[in-house]
Amino acid sequence: MLEKILATKREEISQLQLPEKQYFPKKSLKASLQKTSLPLGLIAEIKQASPSKGVLCETISPTAIARVYEEGGASAISVLTDRTYFQGDTAYVAEVKKTVSLPVLRKDFILSPLQVEETACIGADAMLLIAGAMEAKQLHELYELAYSKGLECLVEVHSEEELESLLAVFTPEVIGINNRNLKTFQTSVSQTEQIAKMVPKEALLVSESGIHTPDDIARVKKAGANAVLIGEQLMRKDDKRQAIIDLFSESAINQ
């Protein structure tokens, strides 16, 4: 599935034109995750659909969702901008930036310098880079370009091998472990438990995907995660603020 998505993305890049630049005060993703009021930092995601789960919500209001996430204690907002597979939109980034005071992470399949430029133009504070989508050297080049544009990066790995290749080139400031197996699309927080021991102490660690219960959060916290990225579990709930409260139940997490 990843290869199919990347092939589509390369076709989109060939036709990409930079939008007019949006100007917003920059907010640090890393700093915001470090000063959370919750047991772990929370990147709450706005996602209408996904290839593995289909449509999560028939209609969405990114601004309304972002506002509720902020009220619930989120440290940052992740915004899906891929149209073809996730029904996202780059316009959502500016809409959310205008609504909340939190940093906004652009979640997409970033493969080229032009997309980094686009990310800076649309007003994001940070962007996702996926280790499984490119060689570590190419990822490092995009990472350096992003930081030169005032953007932070969440660098995502799916395996010990990907992390090992990445660390041979450089150590990202924020590393994400995706709990989804890209071959089967099944999720398990055991992925974070297995890979976290390889993450350098100086990097901030985010556990992504497949987090559905307070026990899942307790497990990744024990494994060394500093933050979690949660999308589907929140998007499926009518009361998203209560969903955050339920997931981050102190008594359950600190058992």
Swiss-Prot record:
Domain of life: Bacteria
Single annotated GO MF: phosphoribosylanthranilate isomerase activity
Amino-acid biosynthesis as UniProt keyword: yes
Pathway in which this enzyme or protein is active: Amino-acid biosynthesis; L-tryptophan biosynthesis; L-tryptophan from chorismate: step 4/5
Entry keywords, A to Z: Amino-acid biosynthesis, Aromatic amino acid biosynthesis, Decarboxylase, Lyase, Tryptophan biosynthesis
InterPro entries: Aldolase_TIM (IPR013785), Indole-3-glycerol_P_synth (IPR045186), Indole-3-glycerol_P_synth_dom (IPR013798), Indole-3-GlycerolPSynthase_CS (IPR001468), RibuloseP-bd_barrel (IPR011060)
Pfam families in the cross-refs: IGPS (PF00218)
GO biological process: L-tryptophan biosynthetic process
PROSITE patterns recorded: IGPS (PS00614)
Keyword Lipid biosynthesis recorded: no
Catalysed reaction, written as an equation: 1-(2-carboxyphenylamino)-1-deoxy-D-ribulose 5-phosphate + H(+) = (1S,2R)-1-C-(indol-3-yl)glycerol 3-phosphate + CO2 + H2O
PANTHER family xrefs: INDOLE-3-GLYCEROL-PHOSPHATE SYNTHASE, TRYPTOPHAN BIOSYNTHESIS PROTEIN
Protein name: Indole-3-glycerol phosphate synthase
Organism: Shouchella clausii (strain KSM-K16) (Alkalihalobacillus clausii)
The encoding gene: trpC
